[in-house]
Protein backbone atom coordinates (compact mmCIF):
# COMPACT_ATOMS: atom_id res chain seq x y z
CA UNK A 1 0.00 0.00 0.00
CA UNK A 2 0.88 3.66 0.05
CA UNK A 3 1.04 3.89 3.85
CA UNK A 4 -2.06 6.11 4.12
CA UNK A 5 -3.87 3.71 6.44
CA UNK A 6 -2.64 2.15 9.68
CA UNK A 7 -2.78 -1.64 9.49
CA UNK A 8 -3.09 -1.69 13.29
CA UNK A 9 -6.63 -0.24 12.95
CA UNK A 10 -7.87 -3.22 10.92
CA UNK A 11 -9.18 -5.14 14.00
CA UNK A 12 -11.22 -2.04 14.92
CA UNK A 13 -12.75 -2.01 11.42
CA UNK A 14 -13.50 -5.73 11.47
CA UNK A 15 -15.07 -5.67 14.95
CA UNK A 16 -18.55 -4.30 13.98
CA UNK A 17 -18.87 -7.08 11.38
CA UNK A 18 -17.76 -9.78 13.82
CA UNK A 19 -20.28 -8.45 16.38
CA UNK A 20 -23.07 -8.39 13.74
CA UNK A 21 -23.50 -4.63 14.13
CA UNK A 22 -22.86 -3.92 10.46
CA UNK A 23 -22.08 -5.61 7.15
CA UNK A 24 -19.93 -2.74 5.87
CA UNK A 25 -17.38 -0.65 7.78
CA UNK A 26 -15.53 2.41 6.51
CA UNK A 27 -12.59 4.17 8.02
CA UNK A 28 -13.40 7.87 7.73
CA UNK A 29 -10.91 10.70 7.76
CA UNK A 30 -13.78 13.20 7.82
CA UNK A 31 -15.49 12.25 11.10
CA UNK A 32 -12.83 14.52 12.62
CA UNK A 33 -12.18 16.90 9.69
CA UNK A 34 -9.48 18.96 11.40
CA UNK A 35 -7.47 15.78 11.87
CA UNK A 36 -7.51 15.30 8.09
CA UNK A 37 -5.77 18.65 7.66
CA UNK A 38 -3.36 17.87 10.50
CA UNK A 39 -2.49 14.65 8.64
CA UNK A 40 -1.37 16.75 5.66
CA UNK A 41 -4.41 16.20 3.45
CA UNK A 42 -3.96 18.85 0.74
CA UNK A 43 -6.55 21.61 1.08
CA UNK A 44 -7.89 21.03 -2.46
CA UNK A 45 -8.53 17.36 -1.61
CA UNK A 46 -10.09 18.31 1.72
CA UNK A 47 -12.51 20.78 0.11
CA UNK A 48 -13.17 18.45 -2.83
CA UNK A 49 -13.93 15.57 -0.47
CA UNK A 50 -16.41 17.69 1.49
CA UNK A 51 -18.15 19.07 -1.61
CA UNK A 52 -18.42 15.77 -3.50
CA UNK A 53 -19.52 13.87 -0.37
CA UNK A 54 -22.20 16.53 0.22
CA UNK A 55 -23.49 16.11 -3.36
CA UNK A 56 -23.45 12.32 -3.06
CA UNK A 57 -25.30 12.38 0.26
CA UNK A 58 -27.87 14.78 -1.20
CA UNK A 59 -28.52 12.64 -4.30
CA UNK A 60 -28.50 9.31 -2.46
CA UNK A 61 -30.23 10.54 0.71
CA UNK A 62 -27.42 9.11 2.77
CA UNK A 63 -25.49 10.56 5.69
CA UNK A 64 -21.93 9.38 5.26
CA UNK A 65 -19.07 11.56 6.44
CA UNK A 66 -16.90 10.44 3.53
CA UNK A 67 -17.25 8.47 0.30
CA UNK A 68 -13.57 8.56 -0.65
CA UNK A 69 -11.54 6.72 1.97
CA UNK A 70 -10.05 3.46 0.79
CA UNK A 71 -9.91 1.88 4.24
CA UNK A 72 -12.96 -0.38 4.24
CA UNK A 73 -14.16 -3.80 5.31
CA UNK A 74 -17.02 -5.65 3.60
CA UNK A 75 -18.61 -8.84 4.85
CA UNK A 76 -19.12 -11.66 2.37
CA UNK A 77 -22.84 -11.34 3.09
CA UNK A 78 -22.81 -7.69 1.97
CA UNK A 79 -21.01 -8.52 -1.27
CA UNK A 80 -23.59 -11.21 -2.06
CA UNK A 81 -26.28 -8.52 -1.97
CA UNK A 82 -24.85 -6.28 -4.69
CA UNK A 83 -23.84 -6.81 -8.34
CA UNK A 84 -20.32 -5.41 -7.89
CA UNK A 85 -19.02 -7.40 -10.87
CA UNK A 86 -20.51 -4.68 -13.11
CA UNK A 87 -18.51 -1.91 -11.45
CA UNK A 88 -15.67 -0.02 -13.05
CA UNK A 89 -12.10 -1.28 -12.90
CA UNK A 90 -10.94 2.28 -12.27
CA UNK A 91 -10.71 4.50 -9.19
CA UNK A 92 -14.44 5.30 -9.05
CA UNK A 93 -15.17 1.64 -8.23
CA UNK A 94 -15.07 2.88 -4.63
CA UNK A 95 -18.06 5.15 -5.19
CA UNK A 96 -20.00 2.59 -7.20
CA UNK A 97 -19.80 0.01 -4.44
CA UNK A 98 -20.91 2.56 -1.82
CA UNK A 99 -23.86 3.53 -4.02
CA UNK A 100 -24.78 -0.15 -4.28
CA UNK A 101 -24.63 -0.60 -0.50
CA UNK A 102 -26.81 2.50 0.00
CA UNK A 103 -29.38 1.33 -2.58
CA UNK A 104 -29.41 -2.13 -0.95
CA UNK A 105 -30.06 -0.38 2.39
CA UNK A 106 -27.10 -2.03 4.08
CA UNK A 107 -25.96 -0.49 7.34
CA UNK A 108 -22.65 1.28 6.88
CA UNK A 109 -20.64 1.82 10.05
CA UNK A 110 -17.99 4.57 10.03
CA UNK A 111 -14.96 4.66 12.32
CA UNK A 112 -12.64 7.67 12.60
CA UNK A 113 -9.17 7.04 11.23
CA UNK A 114 -6.10 9.27 11.13
CA UNK A 115 -4.99 10.86 7.88
CA UNK A 116 -1.49 10.32 6.54
CA UNK A 117 -0.36 11.83 3.27
CA UNK A 118 3.00 10.96 1.86
CA UNK A 119 3.33 9.76 -1.70
CA UNK A 120 0.94 11.48 -4.03
CA UNK A 121 -1.94 9.60 -5.64
CA UNK A 122 -1.35 9.50 -9.40
CA UNK A 123 -4.90 9.56 -10.73
CA UNK A 124 -6.36 12.60 -12.44
CA UNK A 125 -8.41 14.26 -9.70
CA UNK A 126 -10.72 16.12 -12.10
CA UNK A 127 -11.57 12.96 -14.05
CA UNK A 128 -12.11 11.05 -10.79
CA UNK A 129 -14.47 13.77 -9.50
CA UNK A 130 -16.44 13.74 -12.77
CA UNK A 131 -16.70 9.92 -12.77
CA UNK A 132 -17.84 9.89 -9.15
CA UNK A 133 -20.49 12.56 -9.75
CA UNK A 134 -21.71 10.85 -12.94
CA UNK A 135 -22.07 7.49 -11.16
CA UNK A 136 -24.02 9.16 -8.36
CA UNK A 137 -26.23 11.05 -10.83
CA UNK A 138 -26.86 7.86 -12.81
CA UNK A 139 -27.98 6.03 -9.65
CA UNK A 140 -30.30 8.93 -8.78
CA UNK A 141 -31.81 8.99 -12.28
CA UNK A 142 -32.31 5.22 -12.12
CA UNK A 143 -34.13 5.62 -8.81
CA UNK A 144 -36.48 8.03 -10.59
CA UNK A 145 -37.17 5.28 -13.15
CA UNK A 146 -35.75 7.18 -16.12
CA UNK A 147 -32.88 4.81 -16.95
CA UNK A 148 -31.73 1.32 -16.04
CA UNK A 149 -28.23 0.09 -15.28
CA UNK A 150 -27.83 -3.43 -13.89
CA UNK A 151 -24.97 -2.08 -11.78
CA UNK A 152 -27.49 -0.18 -9.65
CA UNK A 153 -30.11 -2.94 -9.52
CA UNK A 154 -29.46 -3.57 -5.84
CA UNK A 155 -32.83 -4.50 -4.44
CA UNK A 156 -32.24 -5.66 -0.89
CA UNK A 157 -33.98 -8.99 -1.65
CA UNK A 158 -31.42 -10.00 -4.30
CA UNK A 159 -28.59 -12.46 -3.76
CA UNK A 160 -25.91 -12.54 -6.43
CA UNK A 161 -23.77 -15.48 -7.52
CA UNK A 162 -20.65 -15.29 -9.62
CA UNK A 163 -19.21 -17.58 -12.26
CA UNK A 164 -15.58 -18.38 -11.70
CA UNK A 165 -13.48 -17.75 -14.81
CA UNK A 166 -11.21 -20.62 -13.85
CA UNK A 167 -13.63 -23.53 -13.79
CA UNK A 168 -16.91 -22.01 -15.03
CA UNK A 169 -18.83 -23.47 -12.07
CA UNK A 170 -21.54 -21.48 -10.39
CA UNK A 171 -20.28 -20.53 -6.99
CA UNK A 172 -21.22 -18.22 -4.22
CA UNK A 173 -18.69 -15.86 -2.71
Give the residues covered by each predicted segment.
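Acceptor/aglycone-binding surface of glycosyltransferases and processive sugar-polymer synthases
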Residues: 7-91, 118-127, 133
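The conserved acidic donor/metal-binding loop of glycosyltransferases
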Residues: 1-4
